[in-house]
């Protein structure tokens, strides 16, 4: 499929929307009421440090809702305002935050059902319905299906994600295989790969090293295909399709690792084909999201403070939140990833998600005496959720009445 031509055609359709409908003032007030917090604003104005009783909070300099997330949520709210009686669907979670997605459900925005095989069932969508595409985007195939049905489409895809798609289009135009640094099952990576002619998804530097070793030294083709069996394009052949490669990434991956992977492939292809031929075999574009980078940079600064523990707040399926937790764990700071204040209590206990493990309960997680707690949150986490977590921590450590944010 000529994905570029399809996008041009879709974007010119009267049924397709990627801007608001004129309800900005009303929606802004709704979002302020539901997601902002005066306590968090107070802490920001105090240099991101705040003390109450025995608890000192050190907030990351950058955390929480990014511009792309705010835009997506606002467009979803505007869509409901503009189509008050129409049936509205969304192809996936608008963002990876349970409270925001629950609010959409309460606004009668329905999620496309998924069958036992994990496939979305679009048969429930009628031509007169409205369909929201989430911040992560949607695959070309999904957009084509919805367009063929004649649905009204509200596209809230983050512009940074669209930037990655444009890079992948350039790979395709130059007959380069797209090496995508990401998680093959993540909605954004699924959408990105749908724009590529040939692609291979690598999760981390270790997988990238395996691929680069294969490029230089060859190897067991069947072993390669089995190892990446969920992560490459149809008919992918490692002996044929790794001669010319371009680098792209899921925008929420660790910036440093994406850069390492890009440099590794560049060095590998330079060794194989020579410095004078590198432009014929390697293509790289900077597709790292500014907001992801800012939050990661802020986390690296935060872990330099003398902290007793770290609380990382965000959806458990949020890639950017997980990477923030990784930074804390690398510094050997006790770290607790929670998705809401409901995970704290009763008493001095917390239900949290350790890295790459299921939820578990930790008793007596807050130490006795004065403590300094580092706080950050993923790009899909509202300030109100962070504020609720802080109030729970203050309540556990102090008998003073909780401040109402």
Curated annotation (Swiss-Prot):
Its cofactor is [4Fe-4S] cluster. InterPro entries: LytB/IspH. Binds 1 [4Fe-4S] cluster per subunit. The keyword Nucleotide-binding does not apply. (2E)-4-hydroxy-3-methylbut-2-enyl diphosphate binds at residues 96, 186, 251, 318-320, 380. [4Fe-4S] cluster binds at residues 66, 158, 289. It holds the Pfam family LYTB. Keywords: 4Fe-4S, Iron, Iron-sulfur, Isoprene biosynthesis, Metal-binding, Oxidoreductase. Pathway: Isoprenoid biosynthesis; dimethylallyl diphosphate biosynthesis; dimethylallyl diphosphate from (2E)-4-hydroxy-3-methylbutenyl diphosphate: step 1/1; Isoprenoid biosynthesis; isopentenyl diphosphate biosynthesis via DXP pathway; isopentenyl diphosphate from 1-deoxy-D-xylulose 5-phosphate: step 6/6. CDD domains: lytB_ispH. It comes from the Bacteria. Dimethylallyl diphosphate binds at residues 96, 186, 318-320, 380. Isopentenyl diphosphate binds at residues 96, 186, 318-320, 380. GO terms for molecular function: 4 iron, 4 sulfur cluster binding; 4-hydroxy-3-methylbut-2-enyl diphosphate reductase activity; metal ion binding. The keyword Metal-binding applies. It is an enzyme of class 1 (oxidoreductase). One of its GO terms (biological process) is isopentenyl diphosphate biosynthetic process, methylerythritol 4-phosphate pathway. Catalyzes the conversion of 1-hydroxy-2-methyl-2-(E)-butenyl 4-diphosphate (HMBPP) into a mixture of isopentenyl diphosphate (IPP) and dimethylallyl diphosphate (DMAPP). Acts in the terminal step of the DOXP/MEP pathway for isoprenoid precursor biosynthesis. This is 4-hydroxy-3-methylbut-2-enyl diphosphate reductase. It comes from Cyanothece sp. (strain PCC 7425 / ATCC 29141). The lineage of its organism: Bacteria, Bacillati, Cyanobacteriota, Cyanophyceae, Gomontiellales.
């Amino acid at each position: 499929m000529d994905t570029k031509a399809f996008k041009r055609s879709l974007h010119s359709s009267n049924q397709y929307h990627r801007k608001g409908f004129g309800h900005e003032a009303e929606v802004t007030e709704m979002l302020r009421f539901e997601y902002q917090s005066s306590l968090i604003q107070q802490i920001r104005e105090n240099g991101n440090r705040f003390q109450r009783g025995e608890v000192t909070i050190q907030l990351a300099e950058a955390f929480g809702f990014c511009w792309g997330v705010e835009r997506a949520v606002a467009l979803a709210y505007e869509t409901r305002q503009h189509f008050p009686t129409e049936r509205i669907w969304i192809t996936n979670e608008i963002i990876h935050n349970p409270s925001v997605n629950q609010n959409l459900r309460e606004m009668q925005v329905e999620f496309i059902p998924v069958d036992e095989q994990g496939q979305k069932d679009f048969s429930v969508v009628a031509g007169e319905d409205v369909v929201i595409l989430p911040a992560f985007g949607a695959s070309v195939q999904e957009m084509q299906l919805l367009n063929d049905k004649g649905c009204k489409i509200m596209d809230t895809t983050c512009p940074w994600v669209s930037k990655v798609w444009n890079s992948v289009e350039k790979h395709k135009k130059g007959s380069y295989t797209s090496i995508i640094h990401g998680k093959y099952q993540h909605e954004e990576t699924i959408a990105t790969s749908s724009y590529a002619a040939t692609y291979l998804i690598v999760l981390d530097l270790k997988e990238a090293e395996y691929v680069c070793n294969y490029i230089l030294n060859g190897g067991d083709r069947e072993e390669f295909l089995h190892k990446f069996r969920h992560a490459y394009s149809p008919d992918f052949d490692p002996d044929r399709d790794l001669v010319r490669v371009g680098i792209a990434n899921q925008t929420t991956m660790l910036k440093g690792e994406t850069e390492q992977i890009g440099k590794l492939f560049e060095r590998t292809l330079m060794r194989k084909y020579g410095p004078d031929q590198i432009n014929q075999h390697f293509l790289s574009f900077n597709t790292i999201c500014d907001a992801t980078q800012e939050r990661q940079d802020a986390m690296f600064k935060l872990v330099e403070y003398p902290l007793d523990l770290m609380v990382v707040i965000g959806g458990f399926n949020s890639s950017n939140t997980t990477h923030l937790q990784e930074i804390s764990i690398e510094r050997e700071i006790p770290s607790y990833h929670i998705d809401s204040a409901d995970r704290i209590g009763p008493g001095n206990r917390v239900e949290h998600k350790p890295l790459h493990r299921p939820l578990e309960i930790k008793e007596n997680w807050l130490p006795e005496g004065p403590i300094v707690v580092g706080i950050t949150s993923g790009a899909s986490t509202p300030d109100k959720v962070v504020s609720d977590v802080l109030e729970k921590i203050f309540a556990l450590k102090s008998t003073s009445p909780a401040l109402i944010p």
